[in-house]
């Protein structure tokens, strides 16, 4: 049960739009996970966002995440962006990552 505030919904729309415009074809998936996805968020909860991309190094990931944080400036939105390549995300599955298991259980795809 996805529980986003109006400000979080606006932020998410703006971030998705930015990624589609600036990085066309690079993003494979955007999902919300954690308390916002489970429906048990508190007023001070952050917005956990998983972004899976086709490929890219840490410089590219930084270029993807920085605008997300910039878009939150002056709002009540506190994004926590987690960017993985599809290969890295698959590797977490192969190694039975607890983080991946939690994300898989809770996540709500939004793109």
Give each language-model segment a name.
Residues 48-51:
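Short beta-strand->loop micro-motif that forms the acidic, two-metal-ion catalytic signature
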Residues 1-28, 38-43, 53-111:
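Catalytic core of pol beta-like nucleotidyltransferases
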């Amino acid at each position: 049960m996805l529980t986003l505030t109006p400000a979080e919904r606006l932020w998410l729309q703006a971030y998705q739009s930015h990624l589609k415009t600036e990085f066309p074809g690079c993003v494979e998936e955007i999902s919300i996970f954690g308390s916002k996805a489970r429906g048990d968020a508190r007023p001070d909860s952050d917005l956990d966002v998983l972004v899976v991309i086709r490929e890219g190094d840490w410089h590219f990931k930084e270029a993807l995440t920085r605008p997300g944080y910039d878009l939150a400036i002056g709002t009540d939105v506190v994004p926590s962006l987690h960017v993985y390549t599809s290969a890295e995300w698959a590797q977490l599955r192969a190694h039975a990552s607890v983080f991946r298991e939690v994300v898989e259980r809770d996540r709500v795809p939004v793109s």
